[in-house]
């Protein structure tokens, strides 16, 4: 005896606890018990074909599931191989020992579904008593009846032989599961679980099996293959109508045997753009109803059904093991989606237009994840803009060869400015828009103007041909700017727009991250990076007031100021009110003064412009009008930023 062997002990098993865990807690839903028992019935037919090929010729194969609501019971009957009494003891009544697994190892058959010897135990998750009446094809004259309450103890007694070999499993349901004894509910559940099983599955007295739907990748359709695929997708899709459908075929290198159908769904939800919906069948039986992780993360609009013999299930048979076959299938699905979108664009242009219109936002992100998709989508996918959805090419043409994109949210100064210029701007705050357009501009060798960035603003607001004299700049700053606003003389289009208020994005960010609650909302690492980025600004300048030196209105205002015209202050007050109103209309703009006071200021200006002329000293009149119209208690420093009061 080797060292330490004398201390070996045998592990004890608490059968009651084990049965309770496996029967009650292994599966996520009691409906899985029905799947497991129908799966066992399917494997019984496969076993019969393997063990008795001559006797199986011409033999009708069927599985029938019936419900008795009054008794609260469900019965699953098959015409398969049946069981002998020794087989009942060795396999049916032994946890973890499956005849199916042994037979697969011996024959190498890929038709058998079972693997763990746990499926029958699931019956006790829904039933307080299970009865199995069976006749084996090996002993067609003998019958046996297995009966158990709870799964820990059982009896096997002789029973009349069944009219033909096969098995009848009867479940006397627990009170909390008696609602399962409803044949309409069984049709719905089994119609999804068993749709790909090759053995017909009937419910009640129905002559039509629940899995009688033609499977387009198995049966060559007589008519249009695409129409057959669309019919299957429409029948199987749970939430959305299919826009197009395309096949999944086995990999040429043999890395995956998966076949099936994928489709583009016509729909989305408000809660998420990720509506991936993939059902995976293992040897014809539903294994994973929500296998979305097999699909690429960018394909939130894809639904599908696939089946494989190579995938490995978990013990609960409700998920897949992440092995080499799983990884190969993920790659194959990505290829199938990309190829399917190409084929749709080429062969079904009407469907392609619907896909672009319905899923343009998601496709922008998809294009960034795959070079082939970017090539396909670059000139077709719609981009959200201030003038509705436009392609990148249309944006470029409308922008005289440049693509304009706003970094702020919609409704800001950028939209107002470019609406006046009749140039559309892309909404860079929308998902994937900015990186998509950056890549488009790079590949198409065109300019991209990012409004709200320093470089974009420099391109938009050009230096004036001649700088304004200091006294004129100071007067304009005092008349037009609020505290925290810096007056910046510039030239920009259209010339009919005299001024525009542009928020300082860095100052806005600095204010947000220095908020007392920022530490609670933002992860510390990201917060440190953001604070390092905004350290270069002190936050005192919250917006820049760009004054259009090409504007005739500005020319007239400055001429009136130079000539001491009494209407200069009135005109300045009117422009100041216009600035406040335009800034208020920009949803992301800064607070630019009191909107109510601005509206009242327009009325004051109109009254002043229409009042009878009264001779006044020009200098006195100008000072009085500014104080009265603008309510100034402060003036601006020499740099154009509003500061403490000083003599003008």
Give residue spans per PLM region.
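GHKL (Bergerat-fold) ATPase N-terminal catalytic module, capturing the glycine-rich phosphate-binding loop
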Residues: 1-188, 195, 406, 620-648
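GHKL/Bergerat-fold ATPase module in large chromosome/replication-associated machines
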Residues: 112, 133-153, 174-179, 184-648
């Amino acid at each position: 005896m080797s060292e330490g062997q004398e201390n070996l002990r045998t592990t004890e098993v608490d059968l009651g606890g084990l049965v309770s865990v496996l029967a009650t807690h292994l599966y996520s839903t009691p409906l899985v018990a029905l799947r497991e028992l129908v799966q066992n019935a399917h494997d019984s037919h496969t076993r019969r074909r393997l063990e008795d090929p001559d006797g199986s010729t011409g033999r009708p194969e069927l599985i029938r599931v019936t419900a008795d609501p009054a008794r609260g019971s469900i019965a699953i009957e098959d015409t398969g191989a049946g069981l002998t009494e020794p087989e009942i003891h060795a396999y049916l009544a032994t946890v973890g020992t499956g005849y199916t697994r042994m037979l697969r190892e011996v024959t190498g058959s890929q038709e058998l579904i079972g693997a763990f010897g746990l499926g029958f135990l699931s019956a006790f998750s829904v039933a307080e008593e299970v009865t199995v009446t069976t006749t084996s094809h090996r002993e067609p004259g003998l019958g046996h009846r297995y009966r158990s309450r709870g799964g820990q103890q059982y009896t096997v007694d002789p029973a009349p032989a069944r009219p033909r070999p096969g098995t009848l499993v009867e479940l006397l349901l627990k009170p909390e599961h008696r609602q399962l004894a409803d044949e309409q509910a069984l049709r719905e559940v089994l119609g999804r679980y068993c749709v790909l099983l090759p053995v017909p599955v009937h419910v009640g007295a129905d002559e039509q099996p629940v899995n009688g739907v033609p499977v387009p990748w198995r049966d060559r359709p007589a008519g249009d293959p695409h129409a057959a695929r669309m019919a299957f997708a429409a029948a199987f899709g749970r939430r959305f109508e299919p826009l197009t459908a395309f096949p999944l075929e086995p990999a040429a290198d043999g890395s995956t045997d998966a076949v099936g159908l994928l489709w583009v769904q016509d729909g989305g939800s408000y809660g998420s753009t990720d509506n991936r919906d993939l059902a995976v069948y293992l040897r014809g039986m539903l294994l994973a109803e929500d296998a979305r992780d097999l699909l690429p993360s960018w394909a939130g609009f894809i639904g599908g059904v696939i089946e494989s013999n190579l995938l490995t299930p978990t013990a609960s048979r409700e998920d897949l093991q992440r092995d080499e076959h799983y990884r190969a299938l993920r790659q194959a699905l990505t290829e199938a989606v990309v190829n399917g979108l190409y084929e749709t664009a080429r062969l079904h242009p009407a469907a392609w237009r619907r896909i672009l219109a319905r899923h343009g936002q998601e496709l922008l992100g998809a294009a960034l994840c795959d070079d082939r998709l970017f090539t396909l989508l670059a000139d077709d996918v719609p981009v959200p803009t201030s003038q509705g959805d436009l392609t990148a090419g249309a944006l470029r043409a409308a922008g005289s060869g440049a693509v304009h994109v706003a970094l702020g949210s919609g409704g800001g100064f950028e939209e107002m400015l470019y609406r006046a210029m009749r140039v559309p701007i892309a909404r860079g705050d929308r998902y994937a828009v900015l990186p998509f357009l950056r890549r488009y501009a790079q590949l198409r060798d065109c300019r991209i103007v990012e409004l709200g960035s320093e470089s974009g603003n420099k391109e938009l607001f050009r230096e004036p041909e001649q700088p304004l004299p200091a006294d004129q700049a100071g007067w304009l700053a005092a008349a037009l700017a609020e505290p925290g606003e810096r007056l910046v003389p510039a030239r920009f289009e259209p010339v009919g727009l005299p001024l525009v208020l542009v928020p300082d994005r860095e100052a806005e960010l600095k204010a947000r991250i220095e908020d007392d609650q920022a530490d609670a909302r933002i992860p510390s690492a990201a917060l440190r990076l953001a604070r390092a980025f905004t350290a270069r600004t002190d936050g005192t300048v919250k917006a820049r007031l760009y004054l259009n030196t090409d504007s005739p209105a500005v020319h007239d205002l400055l001429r009136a100021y130079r000539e001491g015209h009494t209407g200069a202050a009135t005109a300045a007050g009117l422009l100041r009110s216009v600035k406040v109103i335009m800034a208020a209309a920009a949803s992301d703009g800064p607070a630019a003064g009191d909107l109510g006071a601005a509206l009242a200021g327009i009325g004051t200006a109109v009254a002043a412009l229409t009042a009878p002329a009264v001779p006044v000293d020009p200098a006195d009149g100008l000072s009085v009008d500014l104080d009265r119209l603008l309510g100034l208690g402060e003036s601006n420093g020499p740099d154009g930023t509003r500061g403490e009061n000083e003599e003008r």
